[in-house]
Structure formats: structure tokens, C-alpha cells
Amino acid sequence: MARQIGSRSLARRSGRSQYLIGMRPSRRPLRGLLRMNDFLNAIKGLHHPEERPEGASRRTHDSIAALTAAALSTALIALPAIADEEPKYGGALTYMIPADAPPSFDGHRESTYATVHSVAPFYSVLIRVDPENPADITRFVCDLCTEMPQLTDGGTTYTFKIRQDVKFHDGSPLTAADVAASYEKIVFPANGQLSARSSNYLMVDKVEAPDPTTVVFHLKFATSAFLPALADPFNFIYEKAILDKDPRWYEKNILGSGPFKFVDYQTGQSIKGEKNSDYYHKGRPYLDGFTGIYADKQAVRVEAIRSDRAAIEFRSMPPSARDELVKALGDKITVQEGDWNVASAVTPNHKRKPFDDPRVRRALTLAIDRWNGAPAISKIAIVKTVAGIVFPGSPLAATKEELEQVAGFWPDIDKSRAAARRLLKEAGAEGLSFELLNRNVDQPFKYVATWL
């Protein structure tokens, strides 16, 4: 019997207002891929046995194999090395989802782990970060396509050939038309529709499916940001026939072509899936099924792991909760720690005064003491490294010295706040006060909001 806390993960084995704060997976193309793909790899069991890290659980039958050091954040792994073992089939994974419920099931609309951790196992995507090497966020592999495309027209045309052996869970064949329709919804949302990542696709001119096995993306200009944007793990492929009838159907319903079929959803309690015996990646998944349990209170999640009511949480815990589990479980648990690739984000509504004035927005970012705040909050909340828009330590990440030249990252907080006060005065917003909306989840939202 063993447990694992993860980085955003925790695992155990056994037999509208003016201002908003929230943590979300990054919307920049080179962020927001690693950690969410770690969850997808784990639940789908996508690693080859010879490349599995230490710590995979017997109960989860190597489906937790993606929780490597490269998976980043706090990880408590509690097993001897089993890299030489063959994968084992069967069993069910029970994992915690640190939320009361997803706002909707539509991955195109949402940007919260509450949605992707709930429904990603039911869906396919066009391409993804390589599950055999998730630390390399510049390498992408096919899920629904047959091979990665060769660029044409000076890098402005991407042509994908689509597999012909894929079926939706209702028995309908998945074709290029479904892929194109899904990306049309993501890239060019119709009036009244929300697309959380449409701004990542400003380079896209049009998407077309000239035949049932071909999808073509035509770009306005060549850019290396396009493939990372395509590989976003929220880009579920939906059935065109359903979207044509009701483009909002997927907000309240689930029907995909992924490794698991939807079984049951109890609002605020759980979501369940069962193995898709017709899954096109032969031999996967290893699990017979899974259950995700919702709990927005950390104490509930800690107790679930400790008492073996759940095997894993795919996010993190602050040091106090981590240490509590280590103390309770002793040598059955091992800690690995690293960085996150999510942002604790404060988002002003730039369409409302005074936040429509860039001087006010600049003043707000100047007032936040990131360098002193992050280390302090990290002692009681799941807050990690101060960073820019690219994952810290990755090839394109800004250095600390480079960040310190950016407004909001200056090392002298007194200088920053003096500049902030001047800007507010210039904008006629001295004595500014506002309502701060915050997610009703304890970690890390309430702690970060209180500090702010």
C-alpha cells in the first residue's frame, strides 16, 4: 500500500466584476502543456513500460507513470522502482479533483483543471506533447493524425491526414470534418460562444476538410507558435453533427472518442468513466475505469489520500499538508519537488473604468511584490517560482535578471509602488478601491487573494 502526492499531484496505491483572481493553465502556446499533459498521460496510460519512472502504482497499473520529476511541482512517490515490470491491465483509478464542480464540460470554453481533469479521458485531440518525453515542450506527436505534417507555402499551410479507425462513443466514425469543425469552434467562435484560447490562433486564416481524411490549416503568416497552440490539451475533438445542431451541447454533455467512455456524473460529487474497448491506440488504456471525486477543501483531499479512499490528486499541496502526509505514512512516501506551469493570475476588466486606462493597469502590476510575496505564500499555499510568460527553466524562459527589467518584477518594491502611485494620480484614480472576485477553492486562491 503506498501513496503519491503530486505536484499538482497526489497519489496513493492500494490493492464578472471589475477584478478577478484565479489560477489557470497558461494560455500562451509554450506554457500550459506540460502539467495538463501529465494528467492526460497518467489517466490514459500512454508511456511505454521501459520508460516508466519509479513510483507507478499497482492499483493504477502504470497509468501514473507520467508523474516523473519532469512533471514538475511537488510529487510524493511511494514505491520501489518497477521500470522493468510489464504493464498490468485492469483495476480502476480513483483520484481527487480540487474543485466543487466544473463550470461546464466544454474544454473549448473553459480553462480550469476542474474541466480538463473531469472530461479529458473521454476525448481525443489532433496532436499532443510527446507522452514519452513530456519535458520537451517543443516535440509534438499525433493522436488523431497519422503523421506530423510537412509545411508548405512557406510555412503557412499545415496538412494533416486523419486516422480512419476512430469512432465516437456513439458509434459514429470520426472524420476530418469533425476535426475541422472542432477547430472552427476554437479559433473562430460564433457570436455568443466563448473560446478561452482563441487569441492563440490569430495566425489562422481558415480551416478546411477537403476530404474525410484531410484537414488543412491555412495561416496568415508563418509562426512557430502554431503547433504548440494546436497541441493544447483542452482542444477536444467534438462530433460535427452535434455541433451543427447545438454548438453549446458539449457544455452539459459528454461524447468523445478517447480511451474512456462516459458512465456517470453526480454534480459536486464524482464523475466516472469506463474503458473504451474500441480505442484506436491498441493496448491502451490499462485501466478498466476511473472515478474522479470533487472536493474543494484541502482537508477532505488529504484525508481521502491518507485513508485510501483515493489514489491520487493531480495537483499539489502546501508544505504543511505535504508534511502531514509524510508524517502519517512514513517511509511509504517520497517527495519530489519542482516548478509549475500555471499562473496565479489577476485579471482586470479592461472594458470598465478605471481599468480601461493602461496607466491604472500598469500601476496595479507595479504594486504587487512578487519577489517577496511568492516565497512567503509558498509556506502555506501552493505557490511556486516567480516567472514570466514562459515556463521557468525552459529554453525560452526569461532569466531573473531579464525579469527584473519588466514592470511588476522590479527588485525594489518601494520604487515600484512609488511609480504606481504616480500613475494612479496621473489617471485620476487616487484612492482606488475595487471588488476582487476570487475562486471559492482554498488552494491557492484564498491565500493568494488575502495576500493581495
What is each PLM-predicted segment?
Residues 16-19, 37, 56, 88, ...:
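Surface-exposed binding/hinge segments that line
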Residues 186-189, 206-208, 263-272, 291-352, ...:
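Extracellular/periplasmic solute-recognition and catalytic clefts
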Residues 94, 175-182, 212-218, 258-259, ...:
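Alpha-helical secondary-structure segments
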Residues 113, 147-192, 210, 216, ...:
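Aromatic- and charge-enriched surface segment that lines or borders ligand/interaction sites
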Residues 1-76:
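Intrinsic disorder/low-complexity segments
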Residues 127-135, 231-285, 289, 299, ...:
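Gly/Pro-rich hinge or "lid" segments in bacterial periplasmic/extracellular proteins
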Residues 96-153, 184, 253-256:
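N-terminal lobe/hinge region of extracytoplasmic solute-binding protein
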Residues 260, 381-426, 441-445:
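Structural transition elements
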